[in-house]
Amino acid sequence: MKFYLYLSILLILLTSTSFGDIWSNCGPNEKFKITSVSIVPDPPVKGKLITISGSGVLGENLTSGQVAILVKFGLITLINEKKDICTLPGSPYKCPIKEGEYSHTINFTIPEAAPNGKYTGHVSVTDQESSEIACIDVTLTL
């Protein structure tokens, strides 16, 4: 299950135009603008350490909100959950989150046992007024 948590984080961070072949913006009004994303190695390789770094600018203060994550392997739903943005496990940021620049780096290994195939994800982030801050659709093949 830890792999799927990391995959969810990967889906959130893969929002740079350099990864335009695997992600698309599904929201009309992005209040969180990604300024850079890097992933090493690119593409990710099972059994190898992956480093993902991302930074962006939050355009409004957040006092609360949610992250909704849907991850599928083919037709099989792996993750379908909503998390409180203020208490995300492993996040260094706690509410209130002030507008401004943010960056974060994660390191993890995709297990060798992860099945090959097509993974899809949908991530939607909303603020304290249930307004969408960011929305991303991702397709990744291992």
From Swiss-Prot:
Residues 1-20 form the signal peptide. The keyword ATP-binding does not apply. InterPro entries: Ig_E-set, ML_dom, NPC2-like. GO terms for biological process: sterol transport. Keywords: Lipid transport, Signal, Transport. GO terms for molecular function: sterol binding. Pfam families: E1_DerP2_DerF2. Catalyzes the intermembrane transfer of phosphatidylglycerol and phosphatidylinositol. Monomer. Belongs to the NPC2 family. PANTHER family: COUNTIN-3-RELATED (PTHR11306:SF60), NIEMANN PICK TYPE C2 PROTEIN NPC2-RELATED (PTHR11306). This is Putative phosphatidylglycerol/phosphatidylinositol transfer protein 2. It comes from Dictyostelium discoideum (Social amoeba).
